[in-house]
């Protein structure tokens, strides 16, 4: 399918991420209330919340309504195993309430609305629909309902990430960043300071939604409005900084997800002076796309396998905003191998431009042999 024919897809994706992000805002407000959290641990001890399941159900249901569910392929992080456990009735009830509350406002976002509230079985079906494993052929929607759930639980940064892949190529991406400030100047007080403002229905939130379509040469940002869609968008452009000394480097917060020691040594070898911008989730890609940072580096432990839903949406947004994203060997990320980014060379490097990217790649090769990664 030609990229030019994706108007319905990008429009639907942007709208449903706005709706899903609004659900997240409301759920996060309740997290620290008595009995308002419903945070559980999955088999790998990572947290999962009402928002994770609620977003996946909403996105799945909307995509099925708009595009039909017969040949709909959705690759997503969550399944229904946790919700099906005997002690999860309260969690399932909270998910159902959140989903139906959000879908009751779907028409405000220009999206279809259920004739009647969805039952638990319908919500579980919607979540279970997202069981595709992707691959080199065909069209696959790729969803991370709440990327950075730990950040979400802590009242910090997180993202709703939706992408469309066809024949192994990412065609579009949308990032909902409910706690990432629309105005850059808010970052001067630190990323985490922008999250204390309560979102009010019908008003501009502190967050934003970013999106891009492959080949357009443009990436866009809209303010996140709880209860509707904004009427305008702002063009995104990466930073023009190409000197590592002046660059801001993004990296994951959790040491388990990245080798901070190696990235610190790498930054030092290039003369980087600024402290790293440590951010949960794909908000790191948002920071690069908007020019708030120039470099995102992630070097996970060798046993860790990167998943496509953690990168697809962010990669296309950065690239269409003028940036470059590759593995540490300078190769494009391969989204055609299924759930995982197979064949990844050491790590992932996203930069605001080709000149800076080449300098980073060169420094990686120079530093690699002396690292303990």
Swiss-Prot record:
Coiled-coil ranges from the UniProt annotation: none
Gene3D superfamilies: 3.40.190.80, Fructose-1,6-Bisphosphatase, subunit A, domain 1
Residue numbers binding adenosine 3',5'-bisphosphate: 149, 281, 284, 298, 310
Recorded catalytic activity of this chain's protein: adenosine 3',5'-bisphosphate + H2O = AMP + phosphate; 3'-phosphoadenylyl sulfate + H2O = adenosine 5'-phosphosulfate + phosphate
Binding residues annotated for Mg(2+) 2, in chain numbering: 144, 147, 310
Activity control summary: Inhibited by Li(+) (IC(50)=10 mM), Na(+) (IC(50)=50 mM) and Ca(2+) (IC(50)=0.06 mM).
Tissue specificity field: Expressed in roots, leaves, stems, flowers and siliques.
Residues annotated for Mg(2+) 3 binding in this entry: 77
Annotated EC: 3.1.3.7
Residues involved in AMP binding: 281, 284, 298, 310
UniProt key word Magnesium: yes
GO MF entry, a single one: 3'(2'),5'-bisphosphate nucleotidase activity
Cofactor(s) it depends on: Mg(2+)
Chain sites annotated for binding Mg(2+) 1: 77, 144, 146
Keywords: Calcium, Hydrolase, Lithium, Magnesium, Metal-binding
GO terms of biological process kind: phosphatidylinositol phosphate biosynthetic process; sulfur compound metabolic process
Function: Phosphatase that converts adenosine 3'-phosphate 5'-phosphosulfate (PAPS) to adenosine 5'-phosphosulfate (APS) and 3'-phosphoadenosine 5'-phosphate (3'-PAP) to AMP. May regulate the flux of sulfur in the sulfur-activation pathway by converting PAPS to APS. Prevents both the toxicity of PAP on RNA processing enzymes as well as the product inhibition by PAP of sulfate conjugation.
Family: Belongs to the inositol monophosphatase superfamily.
Further comment found in the protein's record: Substrate preference is 3'-phosphoadenosine 5'-phosphate (3'-PAP) > adenosine 3'-phosphate 5'-phosphosulfate (PAPS). No activity observed against 2'-PAP, 3' or 5'-AMP, inositol mono and diphosphates and fructose-1,6-bisphosphate.
Name under which the protein is recorded: 3',5'-bisphosphate nucleotidase AHL
Organism encoding this protein: Arabidopsis thaliana
């Amino acid at each position: 399918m030609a990229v030019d024919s994706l108007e319905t897809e990008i429009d639907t994706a942007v709208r449903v991420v706005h709706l899903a992000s609004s659900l997240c805002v409301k759920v996060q407000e309740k997290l620290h209330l008595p009995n308002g959290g419903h945070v559980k641990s999955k088999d790998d001890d990572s947290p999962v919340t009402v928002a994770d399941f609620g977003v996946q159900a909403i996105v799945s249901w909307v995509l099925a309504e708009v595009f039909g569910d017969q040949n709909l392929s959705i690759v997503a992080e969550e399944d229904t195993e946790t919700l099906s456990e005997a002690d999860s009735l309260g969690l399932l009830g909270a998910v159902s309430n959140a989903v139906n509350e959000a879908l009751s406002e779907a028409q405000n976002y220009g999206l279809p609305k259920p004739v009647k509230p969805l039952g638990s079985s319908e919500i579980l079906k919607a979540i279970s629909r997202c069981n595709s494993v992707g691959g080199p052929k065909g069209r696959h929607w790729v969803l991370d309902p709440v990327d950075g759930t730990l950040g979400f639980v802590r009242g910090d940064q997180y993202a709703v990430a939706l992408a469309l892949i066809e024949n192994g190529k990412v065609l579009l991406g949308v990032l909902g960043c409910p706690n990432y400030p629309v105005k850059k100047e808010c970052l001067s007080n630190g990323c985490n300071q922008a999250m204390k403002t309560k979102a009010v229905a019908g008003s501009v939130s502190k967050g934003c939604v970013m999106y891009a379509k492959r080949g357009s040469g443009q990436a866009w940002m809209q303010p996140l409005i709880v209860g509707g869609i904004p009427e305008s968008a702002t063009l995104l452009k990466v930073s023009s900084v190409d000197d590592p000394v002046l660059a801001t480097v993004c990296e994951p917060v959790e040491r388990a997800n990245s080798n901070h020691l190696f990235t610190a040594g790498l930054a030092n070898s290039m003369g980087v002076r600024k402290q790293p911008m440590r951010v949960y989730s794909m908000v790191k890609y948002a920071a690069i796309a908007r020019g708030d940072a120039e470099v995102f580096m992630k070097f996970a432990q060798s046993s860790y396998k990167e998943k496509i839903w953690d990168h697809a949406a962010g990669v296309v947004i950065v690239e269409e905003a003028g940036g470059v994203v590759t593995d540490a060997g300078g190769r494009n990320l391969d989204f055609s191998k299924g759930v995982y980014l197979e064949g990844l060379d050491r790590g992932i490097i996203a930069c605001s431009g080709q000149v800076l990217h080449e300098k980073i790649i060169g420094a990686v090769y120079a530093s690699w042999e002396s690292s303990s990664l």
